[in-house]
Amino acid sequence: MDTSPPPIAFVLDFDGTITQEDTISTIAHFGIACQKTRGNDLENAWYILYDTYGESFSRSFHGYKPAEADRKTVAEEVTYQRALKSLELGSFNRVSQSGIFKEIGDDQWRKFAKDALEKGDVNVRKGFGDFVKQVNKAKATWGVVSVNFSSQFIRGVLAASAGAGATEIEVLANHPDEEGKLLGPNDGPVMATSDAKLAAMKDLLQKRKSGSKTGFSKVVYIGDSGTDIECLTAEGVIGIAMSTDGKGRLIDILNRIGPSPVHVGSQQEGKSSSLYWARNFEEIIKSPLFGLEGGREI
């Protein structure tokens, strides 16, 4: 009879969470380079796309009511994040129409990811490889939910930075088809906003739960941006905001809507919270919250 406790489920964002910085520009320049070998120079087209998005986002941000400083609850912030859907989907559609990712195969994406890590164009946060090892050792489960353009690029980064422990991991993210059109997880609608990430997290957890007789002892979500707000604050979820210095846009949002996140290393037995922050995965491993360093989970 198996008397082991139910596993912990970790769900991770990718850009700025697993990686130190956003990788969208790195991916875009890879697409530009691939198309250039076929005689198509899309560099200027990409910068137009980039500028168009920036202008649209600025108009939406400054025109939305209630203004940022006046949004004081999770519900108000979630409503704002969901209001960005048409803007984000419009941007994804323009990327699809540009053909920047046309005819880039899965193997090319993975090789590029490996090369980008080796060159230092992409860097993962401190302790990520050890985090994967400890999660697997603890028989916990983990997966990735991301609005990134390429799930295969994510898989390449995971394989190159965490080895065999990451090869069979569920990655729910967008991906381009052969014509360069961006599709969402399982070839569904593009995933671009916080509500879509929440739905993806629930889908991932349901798949994992169906293979477990005991369910999960804890569900932990780790993210770094506004698109993570619904996952971080979902009922029954322990949220960890990733921040290099305990500052930044997401931390500001969480402080504004409350409760403010506490550092994962400051947790003491008998005191509980559902919202934390960490600088990197090394701090998450050492935290007494999850027992990943061989200590007792609290």
Report the location of each language-model feature:
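Alpha-helical substrate-recognition element adjacent to the catalytic core
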Residues: 2-161, 166-175
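Universal eukaryotic N-terminal targeting presequences
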Residues: 1-2, 298
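C-terminal cap/substrate-recognition subdomain and adjoining C-terminal extension
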Residues: 119-144, 148-298
